[in-house]
Amino acid sequence: MFYPDPFDVIVIGGGHAGTEAAMASARMGQQTLLLTHNIDTLGQMSCNPAIGGIGKGHLVKEIDAMGGLMARAVDQAGIQFRILNSSKGPAVRATRAQADRVLYRQAIRTALENQPNLTIFQQAVDDLIVENDRVVGAVTQMGLKFRAKAVVLTVGTFLDGKIHIGLDNYSGGRAGDPPSIPLARRLRELPLRVNRLKTGTPPRIDARTIDFSVLPQQHGDNPMPVFSFLGNAGQHPAQMPCYITHTNEKTHEVIRNNLDRSPMYAGIIEGIGPRYCPSIEDKVMRFADRNTHQIFLEPEGLTSNEIYPNGISTSLPFDVQWQIVRSMAGMENARIVRPGYAIEYDFFDPRDLKPTLENKFVHGLFFAGQINGTTGYEEAAAQGMLAGLNAARLSADKEGWSPRRDQAYLGVLVDDLCTLGTKEPYRMFTSRAEYRLMLREDNADLRLTEMGRELGMVDDHRWARFNEKLENIEKERQRLRDIHVHPQSELLDQVNSLLKTPLSREANGEELLRRPEVDYAQLTALPLFAPGLTDEQAAEQVEIQVKYEGYIARQQDEIEKQLRNENALLPADLDYKQVNGLSNEVIAKLNDHKPSSIGQASRISGITPAAISILLIWLKKQGLLRRSA
């Protein structure tokens, strides 16, 4: 039977991508249905109990800047907050939080259940309804049919998922959950490129069996950072330390002696695992010259006895896992409460997607998260938000939107996936972005909140706070520019106390702040420049904008040059065999990738500047060169 009410958008899957997709669509006013196999696991952290990190924290801030959920949830659930790279420049500083799994899941579910325009329904999805290359609905396990104008697939590791522990394996979406086999088979019938990837998770340890007294502690920062631009440290629950132990030669010997029982080394696992989160057996073999690896013992929550040993992801048999755990300091009597495992699953080539994350071959079908070959909660959530907002726009007959590489890490992520594809689980790093100085955590709202408002994602409260911050920044910069000090000033000694070289000419507040030895707090502590801003976010922006003004201006010039290519659009149905002068290799790559713009084409491996010039000349001659607004 058909469900009585039609929907604008259906989201399939309730993980990090699915929850952001559903929230985005509903916030934009579209009637949205979230289908999940289990309402109790909405927003579940399937692997590590943490949000953020290098590159990843930037994505969380961008999600928040556009009205998304992840940052607000972790502010309510985070049990340890730290700024990574705090001694480095603002471009690579990143926020990371350990999270209480239960509190995080509760925060996500509460937000979903109180979101207008959003319906949640518990049923696994077995099929899609596709008519004339257009998706028009979904069919659940019990045969119930739902109609919609757009469907977002956020199915994580569930598509034909297979769990491996040693040489044994069984079907599963993750530990304790069934796989999605009928839906995987249905998707393989569509004209899409599919492959397999692998990821893994470590065994969980009973904290009561660990001797923490012999292990160094790692505490969070004080004062505590916050993730959301609307958040404050008062929202954080009680804070907890992490602990550090290390593998040793005994650990490595256990691993080397049992490699024949590893499904990866025995050739049973075919999927490629994440390069930057390797299993402990992979680390021991790939870095054979190292006799120790650092392991972080991370608490899973305030009311849980489980410890997540970050750094020993493994698919070795349980008896070997037991030996590995007990070989490390403080863990001699440790007990495992959940075994580690690897999981293989289907993913679909993201080069078959438009930058909006809509599929090129099935109209109205959007993919987000691990189905696109990414790894990580943050990467999934960012894609989910983008897919959800574009599904909502499509259902309202509006054009899609996607950020450029110079606008957001989300733009880098999507462009990398859609242009280059991936053969291994893709994770975000700051090093993937050309314009890191422009794409900082601290200015995510300045980059994206206005666009979020235009798209209908940003509510009145966030918009008012954003405009207040903008006003504070501009007023303070003008105030500093208006205050001058000269070498004959009575206050010269106070100013010189901050400077490495005494002031020899008249200078205003901004010129003094531009000096590397002067920071905003020191400057505004002087009577002449007091009082400083009480809005810490605005004060940080004033300092960064002033100190990095020259560098930012140079990077903006580079961006404007690149935009000329980004805005030169390529016809979606162009057969590059028609373009005289291109090599067979270039023709094959362009026809395979089907880039949407000259800029995207230029980033495909093997596409030379000469080939781009030939293509531009041909497009002009044919009258096909169009530029986006």
From Swiss-Prot:
The UniProt entry, under InterPro entries, shows: FAD/NAD-bd_sf (IPR036188), GIDA_C_N (IPR049312), MnmG (IPR004416), MnmG-rel (IPR002218), MnmG-rel_CS (IPR020595), MnmG_C (IPR026904), MnmG_C_subdom (IPR047001), MnmG_C_subdom_sf (IPR044920)
The UniProt annotation places FAD binding at G13, G14, G15, H16, A17, G18, V125, S180, Q370
A GO molecular function term, named singly, is: flavin adenine dinucleotide binding
Q: Which SMART domains match?
A: GIDA_assoc_3 (SM01228)
Q: Which one Pfam family would you cite for this protein? A: GIDA_C_1st
Instruction: Answer yes or no on keyword Cytoplasm.
Output: yes
Q: Which PROSITE patterns match?
A: GIDA_1, GIDA_2
- Keyword GTP-binding among record annotations: no
Keywords tagged on the record: Cytoplasm, FAD, Flavoprotein, NAD, tRNA processing
Instruction: Report any one BP term from Gene Ontology.
Output: tRNA wobble uridine modification
Please provide one cellular component term from the Gene Ontology annotations of this protein: cytosol
Positions binding NAD(+) in this chain are 273-287
Q: Subcellular location, in the record's words?
A: Cytoplasm
Requisite cofactors: FAD
Q: PANTHER family, alphabetically?
A: GLUCOSE INHIBITED DIVISION PROTEIN A, PROTEIN MTO1 HOMOLOG, MITOCHONDRIAL
Protein's job: NAD-binding protein involved in the addition of a carboxymethylaminomethyl (cmnm) group at the wobble position (U34) of certain tRNAs, forming tRNA-cmnm(5)s(2)U34.
- Assembly mode: Homodimer. Heterotetramer of two MnmE and two MnmG subunits.
Q: Which family does it belong to?
A: Belongs to the MnmG family.
What NCBIfam families does the record tag this protein with? Answer: mnmG_gidA
Return the protein name.
tRNA uridine 5-carboxymethylaminomethyl modification enzyme MnmG
Please give the organism.
Pectobacterium atrosepticum (strain SCRI 1043 / ATCC BAA-672)
Classification from the root reads: Bacteria, Pseudomonadati, Pseudomonadota, Gammaproteobacteria, Enterobacterales
Task: Please name the gene that encodes this protein.
Answer: mnmG
